[in-house]
């Protein structure tokens, strides 16, 4: 059948205030999405597009009319606020729109006036969807929503009309054009539909009756994929098949890339859309979303892919502590998931235990990644200034048996402070891995290589009497990696001295990690890096400079400079959580990946991706819209750098100007050789009291507040 429709709720309301001119214009530029307008009527019967019947929730009305607060019955519920029925359209000329969801950027607030329905229908060249949420409310004020909608449908092309009120839709039957689809909008199952006095859950059980007055239904997405109380998916319902059997189209609502998705989707909104259109069992007829670009990607480029296909071509997908977005860092489960998800390279951050065993652990401080703070070893916490200024319990304070038998892993939560927690059911799942365990696991897997990251080599040599370079080489040799060529061994470090030592002793692929944000590398520093490294890893901000989560109009030459010197470039650190991405990437990890690897123009042109979520990056490599040249769909082109900032009207709201990033110089790269391994033991830390924090779930209201404070 036809591809599912994409309906832009209030335009591109995930970026701009819902129902604003830039929201509609931006969505209309996508061409393939319909424009949704929530119709409200003014005192003089003019239609405006507004997402909320309470104008104070989405406009500056209360500032202009501070005494305008009223209380009315809305579907039988006493509701207090500012209402469009109290104002003539001319009164609203200077009222401007605000974001309706506080966790979104406020930099577009107060800059755009209300859009009348006639303007929305005539100016934005896209299919039109008019939603009438409260017909019975307007009738209290002698305003006929029915007459207004019929008038609009005669003057303009209206493709869809929806309402949660059965009587309103029935009043339109036979009075609108044959091409206009009438759609019954379902609210939560327990709410009562006002004209039938039945709950929406009851109406759902008699879909055949809906066919007499509507061609389709619009349901909240949880009607199709319900979730548990702790936000995991339950088995899908039969509602899609039931609707189709009744001859009804079915549209799913409530999609937004920056909402809390089910943990099954690993914070990947594209994966959620695919669950509704490409699951092998059913496909909805449309998706109502605040971010129309992501479902367009899903439909146009990511449907019907063979996700099991191995593809070790560019961009190289390198895990970061395994699939650490789904399981605790560097555990057996994280590595298994990374391989399962199609990583090309899996990685191990090497630390050392008290008994001299190299292990895979993302931090040298066990407080960061294990349950040591609540164990019998918490009393060993202390400060070692060579490593960090706050107290920690370090891997070299405990033996391997201490760690493996008494501690549990702890999943990383980079955005836990705003309740974007990772996979809480598995927060302590998995087993720790020695380097030897990691090598044995990786060998024989469908990988192009492994990456071993080595930091603190000087400290280990001087203060612990441990030669980590020699230990890594021995472990690699003992595992048989030196006698095979199917998987290459990569060594990554921020220290040139460490890589120089490896180059002297073994033939590995050496990756220099540039751990500061730089715009370019001086020719002399490039020549120096080439002496000891085969590739470089750089931060995302070095590729896409940003200010306050907006891309700035600046293209850094760093990637091209490194590549011109013969150094492939891997970018770190990719995460799926929307809070990790500038707004220009639409709260969509796939959009960010696409921009980073795109060659030419506004693209980053990198050769590899270091990511907590290798499954998202691997799926990108398989998409059907790659290598299309001039025929690449517009939604698969990278954003214009600084383009979104250019839409900000209020100069006071502009992100602060950024100081120029430095250029990487020889002095940044050059280091003295690694010191010889001393005959010593681990230093005794200076003890300090340790505060143990307990993670407590935060309510949705607090989440919104915290998120807004971080913008």
Predicted segments with their positions:
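Phosphate-group recognition and catalysis centered on beta-loop-alpha active-site segments
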Residues: 1-711
């Amino acid at each position: 059948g036809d591809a599912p429709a994409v309906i832009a709720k209030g335009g591109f309301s995930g970026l701009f205030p819902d129902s604003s001119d830039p929201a509609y214009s931006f969505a209309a530029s996508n061409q393939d999405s319909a424009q949704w307008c929530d119709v409200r009527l003014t005192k003089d019967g003019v239609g405006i597009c507004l997402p909320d019947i309470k104008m104070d929730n989405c406009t500056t009305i209360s500032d202009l009319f501070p005494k305008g607060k009223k209380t009315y019955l809305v579907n039988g519920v006493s509701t207090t606020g500012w209402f469009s029925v109290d104002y003539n359209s001319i009164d609203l000329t200077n009222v401007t729109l605000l974001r309706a969801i506080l966790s979104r950027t406020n930099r577009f607030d107060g800059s755009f006036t209300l859009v009348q329905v006639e303007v929305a229908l005539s100016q934005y060249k896209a299919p039109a969807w008019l939603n009438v949420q409260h017909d019975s409310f307007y009738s209290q004020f002698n305003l006929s929503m029915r007459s207004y909608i019929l008038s609009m449908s005669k003057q303009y092309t209206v493709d869809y009309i929806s309402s949660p009120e059965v009587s309103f839709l029935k009043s339109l039957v036979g009075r609108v054009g044959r091409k206009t689809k009438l759609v019954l909008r379902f609210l939560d199952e327990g709410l009562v539909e006002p004209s039938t006095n039945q709950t929406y859950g009851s109406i759902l059980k008699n879909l055949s009756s809906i066919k007499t007055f509507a061609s389709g239904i619009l349901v909240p997405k949880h009607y199709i994929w319900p979730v548990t109380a702790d936000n995991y998916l339950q088995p899908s319902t039969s509602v899609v098949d039931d609707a189709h059997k009744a001859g009804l189209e079915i549209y799913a609502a409530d999609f937004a890339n920056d909402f809390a998705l089910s943990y099954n989707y690993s914070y990947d909104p594209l994966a959620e859309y695919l669950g509704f259109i490409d699951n092998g069992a059913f496909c909805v007829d449309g998706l109502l979303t605040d971010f129309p670009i992501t479902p367009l990607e899903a439909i146009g480029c990511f449907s019907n892919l063979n996700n099991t296909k191995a593809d070790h071509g560019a961009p190289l997908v390198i895990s970061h502590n395994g699939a650490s977005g789904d399981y605790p860092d560097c555990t057996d489960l994280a590595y298994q998931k990374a391989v399962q998800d199609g990583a090309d390279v899996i990685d191990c951050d090497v630390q050392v235990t008290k008994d001299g065993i190299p292990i895979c652990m993302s931090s040298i401080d066990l407080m960061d990644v294990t349950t040591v703070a609540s164990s019998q070893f918490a009393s060993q916490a202390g400060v070692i200034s060579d490593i960090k200024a706050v107290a920690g319990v370090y891997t070299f304070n405990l033996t391997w048996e201490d760690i493996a038998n008494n501690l549990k892993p702890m999943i990383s939560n980079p955005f836990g402070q705003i309740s974007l927690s990772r996979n809480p059911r598995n927060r302590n799942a998995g087993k720790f891995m020695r380097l030897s365990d990691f090598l044995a696991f990786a060998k024989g897997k469908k990988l192009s290589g492994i990456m071993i990251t080595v930091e603190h080599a000087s400290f280990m040599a001087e203060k612990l009497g441990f030669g980590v370079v020699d230990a890594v080489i021995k472990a690699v040799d003992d595992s048989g990696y030196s006698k095979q060529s199917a998987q290459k061994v990569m060594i990554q470090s921020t220290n040139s001295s460490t890589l120089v030592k490896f180059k002297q002793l073994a033939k590995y692929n050496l990756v220099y990690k540039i751990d500061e944000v730089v715009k370019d590398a001086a020719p002399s520093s490039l020549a120096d890096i080439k002496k000891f490294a085969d590739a470089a890893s750089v931060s995302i901000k070095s590729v896409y400079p940003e200010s306050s989560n907006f891309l700035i109009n600046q293209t850094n030459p760093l990637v091209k400079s490194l590549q011109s010197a013969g150094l492939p470039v891997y970018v770190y650190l990719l995460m799926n959580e929307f809070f990790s991405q500038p707004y220009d990437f639409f709260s969509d990890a796939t959009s960010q990946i696409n921009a980073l690897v795109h060659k030419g123009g506004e693209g980053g042109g990198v050769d590899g991706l270091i990511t907590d979520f290798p499954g998202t990056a691997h799926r990108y490599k398989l998409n059907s819209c790659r290598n299309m040249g001039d025929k690449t769909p517009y939604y698969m082109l990278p954003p214009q750098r600084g383009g979104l900032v250019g839409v900000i009207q209020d100069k006071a709201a502009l992100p602060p100007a950024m100081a120029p990033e430095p250029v990487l110089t020889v002095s940044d790269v050059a280091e003295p050789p690694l010191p010889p391994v001393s005959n010593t033991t681990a230093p005794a830390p200076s003890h300090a009291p340790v505060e143990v924090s307990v993670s407590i779930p935060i309510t949705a209201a607090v989440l919104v507040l915290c998120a807004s404070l971080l913008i």
